[in-house]
């Protein structure tokens, strides 16, 4: 397709991708629990991961630094203030009933990655914790289990 061609007169296709990356930090994004892959289900869990009353999340400084490094590497604008949002939804694999994310105020905006001479725009990059993981059909076809070690991974 030539640069000025369009599929339908007056329209040009634009494709966007949402890419999820798990950061290699020692601990989870808002929890002191270890952030290790491949461990048995529900062995790396802290009270913060479960959302028990009275527990308060603390941001993982290493994850924040990795986000800033990504912004610098992509020549992006780095947020001067870190603001997180509480995205409420109810899934069995989200024990708190909400996910902490940077929905409205991401750590990085307007970056660029060059690939084969073409500039690919990075609209934003934000930090957010993972939800849990539902496990279906592993032990019984009538039973679903929840892997709680996943929540709050950066």
What is the role of each PLM region?
Residues 2-145, 149:
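Basic, nucleic-acid-interacting segments
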Residues 150-154:
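Short "domain-exit" segments at the C-terminal end of structured domains
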């Amino acid at each position: 397709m030539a640069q000025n061609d369009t599929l339908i007169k007056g329209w040009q296709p634009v494709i966007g991708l949402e890419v999820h990356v798990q950061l290699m930090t020692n601990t989870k994004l808002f929890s002191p629990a270890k952030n290790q892959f491949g461990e048995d289900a529900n062995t790396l869990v802290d009270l913060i991961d479960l959302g028990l009353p009275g527990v308060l999340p603390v941001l993982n400084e290493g994850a924040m630094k990795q986000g800033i490094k990504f912004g610098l590497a992509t020549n992006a604008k780095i947020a001067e203030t870190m603001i997180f949002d509480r995205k409420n939804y109810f899934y069995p694999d989200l024990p708190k009933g909400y996910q902490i994310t940077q929905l409205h105020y991401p750590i990085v905006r307007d970056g660029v990655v060059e690939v084969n001479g073409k500039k690919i725009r990075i609209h934003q990059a934000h930090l957010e914790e993972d939800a849990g993981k539902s496990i279906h059909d592993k032990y019984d076809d009538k039973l679903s289990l929840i892997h709680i070690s996943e929540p709050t991974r950066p």
